[in-house]
Curated annotation (Swiss-Prot):
To M.pneumoniae MPN_633 (in the N-terminal section), and M.pneumoniae MPN_634 (in the C-terminal section). This is Uncharacterized protein MPN_635. It comes from the Bacteria.
Length: 352
């Protein structure tokens, strides 16, 4: 074996010439050397390099063609570089036992690019789940984050950690969509890089929130459109046909509709209700004598009170107050509505 001094080859490092050994056998020997390490578990391999899980607890190790060239406490994985770039080659010399990261950073990114794909979910999951502990390691590289975004099978969203509206956006997102997202925070520079990348823009929080917001607007517009196209019932089209009423009941119904018209024309705030709401009959109900559906704009009166003008008028006023206040029984706004209607009702009664 012949060893040439590094200075004779323009500081490119130490050139070692091994005679009588095939390149394939040399590569196999290197693989076997790393395979014998009990604290290294191979996770992924490619012609560019291999990725190992290091269980020694002594920091990640960086190898070049089987030789250790650095230890990096901030890296999650250990790496075996097989095809060093020129920068790394120029950095090698006998005086430097532990190369700084700047020498091999691009080589690590190249290895991850050659290994991360949609079939390496274990590798991707470990990078995501360990991001807080190793935020100065692989997770600090935007290229690695983009690789993860393009290949992960998890529902992730990139968010700008410096945005003042991030909490509001996340809240609105979860209010609009039931899908469970993982919010991964980036600094502003990396977040803008994600937004400007057409492949990854759809994973940014702002883009997804705006998309869901627009979908919600379109859905509501479609509901309104369908509602407007649906023919509204006239007052004569009841749930319970008028023909089923006997003469006394029919007289009570006609009286109730006349009172409804009078009340809505006399009491402030009730003017449009008679035109907007449907008044319909329902069969005798032992629990309710009247019902108000504000979302459907329907007021129902029970057949059982058509013969009792006192109960009929009370029920009519009661349900109209539900409609005008949109309040439930016992609420302050419903009770206030009844109070506001009392004086006009008293004057209406005196004028009759």
């Amino acid at each position: 074996m012949e060893v040439d001094p590094a200075e004779q080859i323009e500081k490119a490092g130490t050139l070692i010439t091994i005679e009588g050994l095939k390149k394939d056998d040399y590569d196999k020997a290197i693989v076997n050397f790393l395979a014998l390490r009990e604290d290294l578990q191979l996770l992924a391999a490619s012609p560019k390099g291999d990725v190992y899980r290091n269980t020694s607890g002594n920091g990640a190790e960086i190898f070049l063609n089987g030789m250790k060239i650095a230890t990096d406490e901030d890296f999650l994985f250990s790496y075996h570089i097989k095809e060093p770039n020129k920068k790394l080659q120029r950095s090698l010399n006998r005086e430097n036992k532990n190369l700084p990261r700047d020498c091999y950073r691009e080589n690590i990114i190249t290895i991850l690019k050659s290994n991360i794909n949609n079939r390496t979910q274990t590798l991707i999951d470990e990078l995501i789940d360990s991001r807080d502990q190793y935020d100065n390691g692989e997770w600090s590289f935007i290229d690695v984050k983009k690789l993860i975004g393009l290949n992960t099978n998890r529902n992730i969203l990139w968010a700008d950690s410096s945005s003042k509206n991030i909490e509001k956006l996340i809240y609105s997102l979860y209010g609009m969509d039931t899908k469970k997202y993982e919010i991964l925070a980036l600094n502003s520079l990396q977040y803008r890089s994600m937004e400007n990348d057409d492949r990854l823009k759809k994973q940014t929080l702002m883009h997804v929130s705006e998309k869901l917001k627009q979908q919600r607007i379109e859905e509501e517009a479609e509901k309104i459109k369908v509602k407007e196209q649906k023919p509204r019932k006239r007052f004569e089209e009841e749930d319970l046909p008028i023909e089923d009423l006997n003469p006394i009941e029919r007289e009570g119904w006609d009286w109730a509709m006349e009172k409804a018209r009078e009340l809505c024309g006399f009491i402030r705030g009730w003017e449009k209700l008679y035109e907007e709401y449907q008044f319909v009959l329902m069969e005798k109900n032992h629990k309710y004598v009247g019902l108000c559906y504000t979302d459907q704009k329907i007021i129902k009166l029970s057949r059982g009170i058509l013969k009792d003008e006192y109960s009929l008028l009370n029920t009519l006023v009661h349900e109209i107050c539900h409609a005008t206040t949109n309040g439930r029984d016992g609420t302050k706004k419903f009770e206030r509505g009844l109070t506001d209607a009392f004086h006009p009702l008293f004057k209406l009664g005196q004028s009759k």
